[in-house]
Design a protein with these regions (language model features):
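A short, surface-exposed helix-loop junction/capping segment
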Residues: 1-20
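Short N-terminal helix-initiation segments at or just after the protein's N-terminus
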Residues: 2-5, 36-47
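Charge-dense, low-complexity intrinsically disordered segments
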Residues: 17, 21, 101-104
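Amphipathic alpha-helical segments
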Residues: 20-40
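Hydrophobic beta-strand residues in large extracellular and virion-surface proteins
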Residues: 30, 41, 63, 70-72, ...
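Short, conserved beta-strand/beta-arch hydrophobic-aromatic motifs that form part
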Residues: 44-98
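Well-ordered alpha/beta subsegment
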Residues: 91-122
Length: 122
């Protein structure tokens, strides 16, 4: 019996099913800017989000591609950023920092937040 719609898929299939081409393009620009700096990182996806994981399965960033924004969940960064906020403790999520990006103007800061999350696991 299957519950929910969060079945495993690939990043490519997830992007193919997204409805907003502008947000897909924004995700791909962010990916090109940030992903190249990482070692031993892979992607996984569900119907709801794309996950970046360090080898061994430890997630450091989840990307929810929505109609008007991309919501990114990461580990809480070590420094203060203008983008993002802590997720309430009641959620009990490991990735406890939420960042919303709307345009290319947000990519550099989002990249720094993602790198901070990655560095916490290395």
């Amino acid at each position: 019996m299957k519950y929910g719609r969060s079945t495993a898929t690939t990043e490519e299939n997830h992007l193919r099913n997204c409805k907003n081409d502008a947000m897909i393009a924004l995700y791909l620009k962010l990916r090109a800017a940030a992903f190249v700096d990482f070692e031993n990182v892979s992607t996984a996806a569900t119907a709801d989000y794309v996950s970046w994981r360090i080898e061994g399965g430890r997630q450091f960033a989840n990307f929810y591609i929505q109609k008007k924004k991309i919501r990114i969940l990461t580990l809480e960064p070590t420094k203060k950023y203008d983008l993002g906020e802590n997720v309430p403790d009641t959620h009990l999520w490991t990735l406890n920092y939420q960042t919303d990006i709307y345009s290319e103007n947000d990519i550099e800061e989002a990249k720094n937040i993602i790198h901070d999350s990655y560095d916490k696991l290395n």
